[in-house]
């Protein structure tokens, strides 16, 4: 939970062991506090853009480099019973090259409350109590509108993840020897969260990744191959001529069998 001024609200991080701690703002380093405040501003602009320009804002939004990295780090968002939008972010979870030094290394919840006056005007504010006027009347269909806002944020998140995955792909080669495979596995896991409705995007990214790996490895670890096949279903990669150009029949057989991975077994690609 982000609290910029209000003393009764706090930033609440939690560890991987699910131990919940409360960290007050005055306990945060100034550089981290400043970074989180800038994230709040980005989210507020995103929400305002959705209500003011619901059909034509995404192209403008993805031109913002900081927004791209922030949205790619979003895990999910949800509505609570008190009409608050909670956006869960893990800054160091995305396999990128953005400088996250001024951000916490634990998950952070950004909470924005939604109010509606008698005229149907919707207001969004964070714990800074800085109101953001959203010119929209959602009275009767309010909850439908809120659900669509969550879907909108998720779609922007997908766009931003795709942009970063494609942008950082050539940078895999600068990793120290032996580290590339670990990075690619994390890269693929991020790609697996892209919805199947965006299959053409996943196909293009997978093709680019295979081209890149071809220049590094004469042999791929089986675990990496299986991970790639788990990201793309059989129909997706078999129906794409670019992927079939690089994936051998032996790998496709593995995809059909899908047995537990023996990480010591290597598969030579017929390139």
UniProtKB/Swiss-Prot annotation:
This is Uncharacterized protein YahL. It comes from Escherichia coli (strain K12).
């Amino acid at each position: 939970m982000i609290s910029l001024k209000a003393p009764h609200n706090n930033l609440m991080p939690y560890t991987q062991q699910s131990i919940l701690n409360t960290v007050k703002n005055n306990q945060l380093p100034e550089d981290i506090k400043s970074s989180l405040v800038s994230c709040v501003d980005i989210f507020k602009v995103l929400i305002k853009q959705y209500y003011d320009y619901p059909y034509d804002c995404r192209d403008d939004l993805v031109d913002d480099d900081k927004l791209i990295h922030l949205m790619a780090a979003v895990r999910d968002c949800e509505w609570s019973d008190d009409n608050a939008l909670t956006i869960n972010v893990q800054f160091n979870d995305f396999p990128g090259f953005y400088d996250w030094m001024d951000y916490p290394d634990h998950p952070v919840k950004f909470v924005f409350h939604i109010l509606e006056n008698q005229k149907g005007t919707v207001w969004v504010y964070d714990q800074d109590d800085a109101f953001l006027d959203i010119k929209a009347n959602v009275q009767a269909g309010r909850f439908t509108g809120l659900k669509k806002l969550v879907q909108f944020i998720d779609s922007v998140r997908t766009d931003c993840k795709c942009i970063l995955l494609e942008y950082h792909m050539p940078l895999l080669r600068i990793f120290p020897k032996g580290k590339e495979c670990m990075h690619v596995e994390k890269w693929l896991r991020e790609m697996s969260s892209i919805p199947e409705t965006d299959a053409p995007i996943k196909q293009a990214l997978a093709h680019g990744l295979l081209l890149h790996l071809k220049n590094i490895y004469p042999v791929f670890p089986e675990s990496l191959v299986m991970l790639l096949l788990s990201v793309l279903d059989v129909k997706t990669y078999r129906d794409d001529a670019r992927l079939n150009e690089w994936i051998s029949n032996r790998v496709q057989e593995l995809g059909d069998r899908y047995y537990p991975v023996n990480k010591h077994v290597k598969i030579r690609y017929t390139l």
